[in-house]
Amino acid sequence: MVVDDSAVVRQVLVGVLNDAPGIDVIATAADPLLAIEKMRQHWPDVIVLDVEMPRMDGITFLRKIMSERPTPVVICSTLTEKGARVTMDALAAGAVAVVTKPRLGLKQFLTDSADELVATVRSAARANVKRLAARVTAAPLEAEVKHTADVILPAQSGRALAQTTERIVAIGTSTGGTQALEEVLTALPRVCPGIVIVQHMPEKFTAAFAARLNGLCQIAVKEAANNDRVMPGRALIAPGGKHLLLRRSGAQYFVEVLEGPPVNRHRPSVDVLFRSAARAAGSNALGIIMTGMGDDGAAGLLEMRQAGARTVAQDEHTSIVFGMPKEAIKRGGADRILPLGAMAREIVTQLQ
């Protein structure tokens, strides 16, 4: 079902999704109240939802759905600061993913983004929303050419030189990751290793996400900027639309934020972060791959393990989408498989 107050958006989304094999849009609605009436007749497998609508806003509608009958919801939001803040509230309330739409050139943009829309809806249909709904406590695919991390950071042999004893944590996640990261980071004490994070998310949204977490956590959380120090008690989140690399200068770690082609169709890419962590930190790192579709991060986690790092994959039961962790496990990149609730303890105890 598509719920959006724009007739143009509804028309284009229906056309794009109905053209995809295995997807059938059973209904559309201009606002949540109309959607509720239609859902009484035929409940959808996935809902594509705008967040700013008349009569009832999307967040209220989403909370109603998640409390009564948990259903995968994909947020379709405008690429603005206000849209980003509202979308963060939606993700906290149980939405599984977000796709963006501009204020201008809307029809062409949605048509050009057809592959992303279809992939996101397919992923949402597989999401473990019952697990997600139980966790809720608060009131992007790009180019067709699939690059590897080599386009950003060429592979090299050998382990990282042990020039420092400072420990770091590298975390990669995608679909369902906003809720998973909130659960992990809010459980951490103020004194913990420095953390670098890639969460697949559009540009402009990561700053709002980091700000929200910063207000909830004992540790500091911010959107990473070029040359930021990686310090104990602070987490840096890759900005949407840019890659994040871990670097080292003497005994200190810092991050590099840079442009470049999408890797595994993502920018930022988990593989890029993990490869840089393997190279810069070696055995002083802990790599964690969590819920998400696809295989981004699977190769990089294996590189971290081969460089001497401890590596962990989230288990299937607690993953919203068991794609990235499953692939990492299959390739031998994870030396431990843990439920989400054990991740914070792993960060604190394994890196002491």
From Swiss-Prot:
Residue span(s) of domain CheB-type methylesterase: 162-352
Q: Which residues form the active site?
A: 174, 200, 296
What broad class describes the main subcellular location of this protein? cytoplasm
Q: Response regulatory domain: which residues?
A: 1-116
Query: Is RNA-binding one of the keywords?
Result: no
* Catalytic activity entry: [protein]-L-glutamate 5-O-methyl ester + H2O = L-glutamyl-[protein] + methanol + H(+); L-glutaminyl-[protein] + H2O = L-glutamyl-[protein] + NH4(+)
SUPFAM superfamilies noted in UniProt? CheY-like, Methylesterase CheB, C-terminal domain
Q: How is it modified after translation?
A: Phosphorylated by CheA. Phosphorylation of the N-terminal regulatory domain activates the methylesterase activity.
Q: What is this protein called?
A: Protein-glutamate methylesterase/protein-glutamine glutaminase 2
